Each structure stands twice: as structure tokens, then as C-alpha cells.
Regions:
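Negatively charged
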Residues: 1-299
């Protein structure tokens, strides 16, 4: 087994990387035996080829860098499949399961419209913004990898699959310990998404589901929302403009703190096919006029 990212294609494709190479160590190979240092120059692969890329970057990809220096792949040509463990870019010998720095893989495949298959993302200990925008704009992406972490980090999955218009099924999301903005806009504008993940967490964090399924126009059924402890803006605009959504989840909130802000703000605005209107608990109604709140915010 070769510990590296593996790239294949259906026709001639050029793969390169933009961003700052300073402090990074990456190698490439066409046979998994003969390795050469990669200086981000263009690498060509044909239908019968496999390109391998690996690294030794124990401090992570984007540690201490400005956003305009973050590294990201570029692909031009045919459709591209990417296999292998993403952590082979961090330490191909040991394959750690800990993300070593904040924003580590930020935008790594952003706008790679040729990418159809995502690599494995096995890390169980995440870092702030580690997968933010990672596959944003990957309009050909149809297959994602598992996301096994059960404890999340601030904005770790935010905008991760934004605009992945070919994605029909979301990966499982087993996390029970959330973080601020962890799922913010994760699937926004995934217009083909039909199968949504279960969301098992019972205690929410500020903006955790903010715009999570915004404009997912193929989604017909929302996931169950079992949370009993909410947070500021936790569900804000979560299903906004999900024009095919027919069934809304129950909102079984048992604990609401006085002063809680925007937890259901705009949650179902623009859901023009909705057949059942969500109902809030009596404890919530007692804190404001429910009808007014629904008209102005929830629906």
C-alpha cells in the first residue's frame, strides 16, 4: 500500500497547486517508487496514469500563513478522482489522525470543478477551520468521504461543500459535541442534495447549523433535530430556500435561556413546498408572540 494521495483521470489532465510553498515538503511519483520533490509545477496525467502526491508537513499546511498564501490544487482537463488518506500530505509515514494546525486544509480543492471523488478524511481530532471551503465549488463532486470526528472545532466544516451541485448524498455526521459555526453553510447551494445526514447532538453551539442547507433545492425531508439545549443563531436560515422541502422537523426544545438570540431566525424562509408548519414549544411561545415570530422569521 502506498501512503499518498492518488489521482486518476478519464482524459489528459494538468494538476498543479497555487499558494506559497515556503516551508512545505511535497513529493510526487507516477509509479509509487521513484519520488521527486514537487515545487508546485504542472503535472500531467493521462487516462492510463496514476499520480501520487505525499508530504512531510507535521506542522500542517497553512500554519501562520495569510489567506492568499493558502495552498490549493488546480485541475484542468478531464474528470479527476482522488483517493487515499489526506493525512499523507501531513506525515505519509505515520498517517496521524490529528489535524496539526488551524485552517490546515482550507480551500485545498476549492473550485476544482473536475474533481468527482474526495479523498479520505479520517482525522478524529480537528482544528479551527481545518476543512473550511475544502471542496467549495467542486461542481462535479459526487462522492464524499466519511467524517468520523465526534468532537468538532470552531468552523471546522464551514462552507466545506458549498456549491457542490452534483452531490446527492451527504456524509454521516456522528458528532455529538459541537462547536461555534461548525456546520455553517456546509451544504449551502448543494442543489442536487436529496439525502441529508442525521444530526444527533442534543446540545448546540452558536451558529452551529447556520445556513447549513441554504438553497438545497432538491431536499424534500429535513433531518430530525433532537437538541434540547439551543444557542444563539443555532438554526438561523438552516433550510432557507429549500424549495422542495415538504416535511419540517419537530422542534422539541426543552431548555431555552432568556436572552437567546435568533435561534430559529429565518429557519424555513422560502420553503414554498412546506406542508407542515413547525411548532415551537409553549416555553418558547411564552417569551414572545409566536405568530409574529413565525411570520417575520421562521417561515
Amino acid at each position: 500500500m502506498i501512503n499518498a494521495l492518488k489521482f486518476t483521470t478519464n482524459s489528459k489532465t494538468i494538476i498543479s497547486m497555487k499558494g506559497s510553498k515556503t516551508g512545505l515538503s511535497l513529493e510526487y511519483s507516477y509509479d509509487g517508487i521513484d519520488w521527486k520533490e514537487w515545487d508546485f509545477n504542472s503535472l500531467s496525467i493521462n487516462k492510463s496514469d496514476t499520480l501520487y502526491i505525499r508530504g512531510n508537513n507535521p506542522n500542517g499546511f497553512n500554519r501562520g500563513r495569510a489567506v492568499d498564501e493558502y495552498c490549493s490544487f488546480e485541475m484542468n482537463g478531464g474528470k479527476v478522482r482522488c483517493y487515499g488518506n489526506i493525512m499523507s500530505l501531513i506525515d505519509y509515514k505515520n498517517l496521524p489522525n490529528i489535524i496539526p494546525c488551524e485552517y490546515c486544509f482550507y480551500g485545498l480543492f476549492k473550485d476544482c470543478t473536475a474533481l468527482t471523488t474526495a479523498p479520505e478524511l479520517p482525522a478524529t481530532k480537528l482544528a479551527k477551520g481545518c476543512y473550511r471551503f475544502m471542496f467549495s465549488g467542486c461542481t462535479s463532486l459526487t462522492t464524499t468521504s466519511e467524517l468520523p470526528a465526534t468532537e468538532l472545532a470552531t468552523e471546522c466544516y464551514s462552507w466545506m461543500f458549498y456549491g457542490c451541485t452534483s452531490l446527492t448524498m451527504a456524509p454521516e455526521l456522528p458528532a455529538t459535541k459541537l462547536a461555534k459555526g461548525c456546520y455553517c453553510s456546509m451544504f449551502e447551494k448543494c442543489t442536487s442534495l436529496k439525502i441529508e445526514p442525521a444530526l444527533p447532538a442534543t446540545t448546540l453551539k452558536d451558529s452551529c447549523y447556520y445556513r447549513m442547507f441554504f438553497n438545497c433545492t432538491s431536499l424534500t425531508v429535513a433531518p430530525e433535530l433532537p437538541a434540547t439545549k439551543l444557542a444563539n443563531w443555532c438554526y438561523s436560515y438552516m433550510f432557507k430556500k429549500c424549495t422542495s422541502l415538504k416535511i419540517a422537523p419537530e422542534l422539541p426544545t426543552a431548555e431555552l435561556t432568556i436572552g437567546l438570540r435568533g435561534c430559529y431566525d429565518g429557519m424555513f424562509i422560502g420553503c414554498t413546498s412546506l406542508k407542515n408548519k413547525p411548532e415551537l414549544t409553549e416555553s418558547y411561545k411564552s417569551r414572545m408572540t409566536f405568530k409574529e415570530y413565525c411570520q417575520r422569521h421562521v417561515l
